Amino acid sequence: MTNQRRVLVTGGGGFLGRAIVERCLARGWNVRVTGRRVHADLTTRGVEFFAGEISDCQHIRQAARGCEAVFHVAAKAGVWGPRADYERINVGGTQSVIDACKAEGVPYLVHTSTPSVVFNGESFRGADEMLPYGRNWLCDYARTKAEAERRVRTAIVSGLRACSLRPHLIWGPRDPHIFPRILARARSGALSIIGDGNNQVDVTHVDTAADAHLSALEALIAGRANGQAYFLSQGEPVRLWEFINRLLKGAGLKPVTRRIPLPVAYAMGATLEATWATFRLSGEPPMTRFVATELAKDHWFDVSAARRDLQLRPAHDTWEALDRLAAELRSA
């Protein structure tokens, strides 16, 4: 690969995708982006947009033509929605990217996955990539992302050099998902601690995750990382509810103190899921079995492999970055 690289970022207008795009631009690379809509602020910086569906292989082939690498970030996230949508976007979309890389001779693929692919309802404390994929899925997001990751691993047999990255709980400036939801629920009085409130989780600043994606490409070029999956994080777990309450305090909100036992929250989630499915209600249920479990259990992983192969390191101190972000949210 030359220094003047041409790369494709699927989902490049999203939270993580945009951070990757900005790093590629900073290196002087030619950047293409696929997505459902054009982002004018990126086109003015020279980004070439290809608007269309990720599951349309011909569309992805056109976008990938002449590229030297693809960062496949696009996905349907969330814990609720039509199963067919998760299949089409997360599985079908990933297969389209793989097929496009093969057809257009793109040698390198960095796939954004998730630790949810190993979800089994239990706590993880320092677990590594030897963990098997989950089986008893509680949401289609985790199930379809696991299948997508399997397909990426299988694709290396045909000569594609690829790896999958599993960042846990991505957050940071411009986060459109996690923090806005937490703040909205806190303001409405609907936020509760699930479980005993002492569970530890990994968190990943968006800059840490974006840096790791570019490092993964360099690792593939250097002959490392091919066929591998890597957990990503800041490298030190945090107590989830301490983290959330520090965010709330910095944003000028009261800390959450009300507790709901996990069995109660889990049963509530099952009931709400059934209600939403039966009556085909719009939006996500306010609680699901998957969310209840994630909010109450330990989820932190050994990132030694990413440190070794990708030179993973946090882009910012976790608590300092959280305080800065909370202050920005308070003044917004």
What are these model-derived regions, one by one?
Residues 41, 47-92, 100, 120:
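NAD(P)H-binding glycine-rich loop region in Rossmannoid oxidoreductase-like domains
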Residues 147-148, 176-181, 195-218, 227-228:
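Substrate-positioning beta->alpha
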Residues 219-285, 319, 323-326:
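Mid/C-terminal beta-alpha module of Rossmann-like enzyme folds, strongest
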Residues 6, 301-309, 313-332:
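Amphipathic terminal alpha-helices
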Residues 206, 245, 268-313:
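Conserved C-terminal active-site "lid" loop/helix of NAD(P)H-dependent oxidoreductases
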Residues 7-27:
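N-terminal Rossmann NAD(P)H-binding glycine-rich loop of SDR-like oxidoreductase domains
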Residues 137-163:
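Active-site Tyr-X1-5-Lys
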Residues 92, 96-140:
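Conserved Rossmann-fold NAD(P)-dependent oxidoreductase catalytic core, especially the SDR/UDP-sugar
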